[in-house]
C-alpha cells in the first residue's frame, strides 16, 4: 500500500522550465483544464490613487515598497508567495538594474541591465523570447519558483518606469523546480523547440468554396465518434480596398469583411459569432501579420490555429450579410481528440460601440460565467482626431474578486508596445498590423493572445478596458474576445448588427502648393538630420528635422520658383521647448533672425519676407545661433514642414 501511495504522489506533474516552454507553443493545451491549476496575476505600476479617482493616470514609478540591500535602495515591483512562475515582463522605459530573488533568498539569482533583458540583448534570453515591439520592451520566458519570487528595480531617481510583471500562482503543494540560471543549458533542447514553435507553420492544404449569394451561407460539418478537434481554420475572400472609392462603398474589403459573419457550434452549442475580419484580427481590410494563433497572409488568406475540440460534431459556417454575392473559400481541418471532463470549448465574441469619450467609461470586452481560460483579445479603433485614444488601463477580474487580478497602465501597454507608437509589428503573441492611419488618427488594429499568460477562471471572468481618450470625441472601439470554457458556459451578449459599419476617420490632406520640407534636398555642416513622421497636423505628416547643430552650422536647401516675380515666402516651422534660434536667409537677401523656442510643441506659418525672385531654384539657408536661454538642456532643433510661395 505504501508503494502505491508513493507511486501516486510521484505521478503528480512537476512544473519546471521545460514544461512551461512547451506551453508557450502548444495551442492544444489551452483547450484543457490546467493541471496543475493556477491563477494568473499581474504586478504593474498602475496609479495607486484609484480609490479616489477611478481614471487616475499616474501609471509610472509606482512600487509595492522600497527595501535596502547592501546599501542599495531597491524598489519592489513584484512579490509573489508560494509556488508559481513568472512568464511575462514588459516595460515602456526599461532603465537601471533589475533583480530576481527566488524562494526567499537574500542574494538575487539574476541581476542585470533591465534594457538588455527586455530587448533581446541579454544572452540568457535572446529573441524570440525577448524583443522590442514599437517601443515596448518584452520578455516571455518562464522563471518558475517553489516558494516565491521578488522582483526589484534600482535606477535613476528622476526616472519613473512603467512595468508589468505577469506571474502564475499555483495551488499550495504544487511541485515546482525553481529556476536556476546556470542550469539553463539542460533545458536547451526545450528552449530551441520553443523558439522554433513560436514561428507559425501553415499547412499547405487547399481551400474550397465559391460564390456565396447575398444572404447565403458557406459551411462545413464534422463528426467524430471518438471526439475530435478543428485545428486549422482558413478563409480567403475575394475583396480588396480601393483608395479611389469612398470609405463607405459596400465593395470595399473592410465593409465586405464586416458583413461576413463567422459562426461555430460544437455539439450543438454555438460558441463563436464574430465578423470575419475581426475574428482574424484584420477588421480594416486585409492587414498582413504573423502571430502564433492567427496569421493574415499577403495574398489575403486568413488562418486561425486555435484548437477547437468537440465531443461528437462541429459546424462552421460563414453568413454573407452583404447585399451582393461574395467569392470566398474556406478550409477547416479535423483530427481525433479525446473529449474528457476537463476539455473546454473554444469561444469568440465581438462587440462594437461608438460613444463620446466624456465622461470616461469602462468598455467591457467579455463577461463570462463558468469555468475556463481567457486567451486573447482583438481591438479595432476608428479615431477621428489626432489625439491619443488608448490611455485606458485593462481591468480583468477573476471569479468575482473585489480588485482585478490584472490592472494595467495603458491600452498600448496591454498590447505590448508603448508610447502611442503606431509603427506596425508582428510578434508571436501580439501584433499591430498596417492600417490606414496617420499617427494615432484613423484606423488602428491591435491583437494580444494570452498563450503562456492565459487567465484561468473557475466561476467567472470579466475583461474591461478604460475608454480613456485625450480628446472629447465620438470614438469607435470594436473588440473580439477569445476564451475556452466548459460546455454550457454563459456567454457575453450577442453582437448588435447595427454596429457593423466601420466609421470613416478621414486623414488630413497636404496643403495645396506646399513645397514639403521632407521632400527637398538638404545639406548641413553639422548636427544630425532625419525625416520625422507621426504628426497629423503637418502638411505631409512629416517634416525635415535638424538636431544638435552647433552655433554657426548651416542647413541649406532650395525652393523652386515657377516664374520670375515678386513673392512672399512662407515657411511652416516647428516651435517647441527644445527648438532653437536661427538666422534664415532667402537667396542673397538679408537674413532674418527667428526664435523657435516656446513651451509647447506647435507648427506656425511664418513669413520669411517678400522678395523679387528669378525663375528656377532659390537657395534658403538656416544658420544656427545661440540657443534660447530657456531652451530645454540648451538644445537647438529645427523643424521645417513646408515652404509656400504667394505672388504679390
Give, region by region, the residue ranges found by the protein language model.
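Sec-dependent N-terminal signal peptides of Gram-negative exported proteins
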Residues: 1-11
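Extracytoplasmic
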Residues: 393-394, 398, 407, 497-648
Amino acid at each position: 500500500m505504501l508503494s502505491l501511495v508513493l507511486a501516486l504522489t510521484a505521478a503528480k506533474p512537476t512544473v519546471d522550465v521545460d514544461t512551461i516552454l512547451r506551453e508557450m507553443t502548444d495551442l492544444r493545451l489551452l483547450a484543457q483544464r490546467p493541471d496543475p491549476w493556477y491563477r494568473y496575476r499581474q504586478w504593474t505600476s498602475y496609479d495607486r490613487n484609484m480609490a479616489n479617482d477611478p481614471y487616475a493616470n499616474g501609471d509610472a514609478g509606482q512600487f509595492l515598497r522600497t527595501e535596502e540591500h547592501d546599501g542599495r535602495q531597491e524598489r519592489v515591483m513584484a512579490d509573489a508567495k508560494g509556488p508559481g512562475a513568472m512568464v511575462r515582463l514588459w516595460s515602456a522605459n526599461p532603465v537601471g538594474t533589475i533583480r530576481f530573488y527566488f524562494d526567499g533568498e537574500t542574494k538575487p539569482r539574476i541581476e542585470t541591465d533591465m534594457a538588455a533583458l527586455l530587448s533581446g540583448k541579454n544572452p540568457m534570453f535572446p529573441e524570440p523570447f525577448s524583443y522590442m515591439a514599437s517601443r515596448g520592451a518584452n520578455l516571455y520566458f518562464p522563471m518558475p519558483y517553489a516558494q516565491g519570487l521578488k522582483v526589484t528595480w534600482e535606477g535613476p531617481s528622476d526616472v519613473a518606469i512603467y512595468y508589468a510583471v505577469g506571474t502564475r500562482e499555483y495551488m499550495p503543494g504544487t511541485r515546482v523546480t525553481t529556476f536556476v540560471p546556470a542550469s539553463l543549458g539542460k533545458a536547451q533542447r526545450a528552449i530551441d523547440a520553443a523558439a522554433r514553435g513560436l514561428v507559425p507553420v501553415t499547412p499547405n492544404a487547399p481551400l474550397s468554396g465559391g460564390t456565396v449569394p447575398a444572404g447565403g451561407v458557406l459551411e462545413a460539418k464534422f463528426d467524430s465518434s471518438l471526439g475530435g478537434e478543428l485545428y486549422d481554420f482558413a478563409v480567403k475572400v475575394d475583396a480588396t480596398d480601393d483608395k479611389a472609392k469612398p470609405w463607405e462603398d459596400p465593395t470595399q474589403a473592410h465593409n465586405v469583411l464586416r458583413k461576413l459573419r463567422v459562426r461555430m457550434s460544437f455539439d450543438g452549442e454555438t460558441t463563436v459569432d464574430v465578423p470575419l475580419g475581426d475574428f482574424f484580427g484584420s477588421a480594416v481590410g486585409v492587414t498582413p501579420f504573423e502571430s502564433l494563433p492567427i496569421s493574415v497572409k499577403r495574398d489575403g488568406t486568413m488562418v486561425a490555429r486555435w484548437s477547437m475540440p468537440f465531443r461528437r460534431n462541429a459546424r462552421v459556417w460563414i453568413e454573407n450579410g452583404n447585399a451582393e454575392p461574395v467569392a470566398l473559400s474556406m478550409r477547416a481541418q479535423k483530427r481525433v481528440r479525446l473529449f474528457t471532463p476537463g476539455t473546454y470549448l473554444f469561444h469568440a465574441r465581438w462587440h462594437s460601440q461608438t460613444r463620446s469619450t466624456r465622461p470616461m467609461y469602462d468598455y467591457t470586452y467579455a463577461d463570462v460565467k463558468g469555468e475556463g481560460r481567457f486567451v486573447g483579445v482583438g481591438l479595432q479603433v476608428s479615431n477621428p482626431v489626432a489625439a491619443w485614444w488608448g490611455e485606458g488601463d485593462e481591468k480583468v477580474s477573476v471569479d468575482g474578486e473585489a480588485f482585478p487580478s490584472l490592472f494595467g497602465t495603458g491600452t498600448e501597454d496591454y498590447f505590448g508596445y508603448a508610447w502611442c507608437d503606431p509603427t506596425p509589428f508582428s510578434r508571436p503573441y501580439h501584433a499591430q498590423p498596417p492600417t490606414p492611419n496617420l499617427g494615432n488618427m484613423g484606423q488602428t488594429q491591435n491583437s494580444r493572445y494570452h498563450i503562456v499568460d492565459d487567465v484561468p477562471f473557475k466561476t467567472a471572468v470579466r475583461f474591461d478596458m478604460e475608454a480613456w481618450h485625450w480628446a472629447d470625441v465620438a470614438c469607435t472601439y470594436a473588440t473580439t474576445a477569445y476564451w475556452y470554457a466548459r460546455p454550457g458556459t454563459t456567454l457575453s451578449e450577442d453582437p448588435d448588427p447595427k454596429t457593423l459599419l466601420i466609421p470613416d476617420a478621414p486623414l488630413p490632406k497636404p496643403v495645396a502648393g506646399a513645397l514639403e520640407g521632407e521632400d527637398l534636398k538638404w545639406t548641413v555642416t553639422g548636427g544630425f538630420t532625419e525625416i520625422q513622421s507621426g504628426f497629423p497636423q503637418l502638411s505631409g505628416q512629416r517634416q525635415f528635422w535638424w538636431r544638435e547643430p552647433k552655433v554657426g552650422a548651416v542647413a541649406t536647401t532650395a525652393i523652386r520658383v515657377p516664374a520670375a516675380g515678386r513673392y512672399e515666402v512662407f515657411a511652416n516651422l516647428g516651435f517647441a521647448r527644445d527648438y532653437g534660434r536661427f538666422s534664415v536667409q532667402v537667396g542673397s537677401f538679408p537674413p532674418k533672425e527667428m526664435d523657435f523656442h516656446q513651451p509647447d510643441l506647435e507648427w506656425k506659418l511664418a513669413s520669411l519676407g517678400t522678395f523679387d525672385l528669378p525663375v528656377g531654384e532659390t537657395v534658403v539657408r538656416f544658420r544656427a545661433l545661440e540657443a534660447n536661454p530657456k531652451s530645454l538642456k540648451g538644445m537647438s532643433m529645427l523643424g521645417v514642414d513646408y515652404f509656400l510661395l504667394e505672388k504679390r
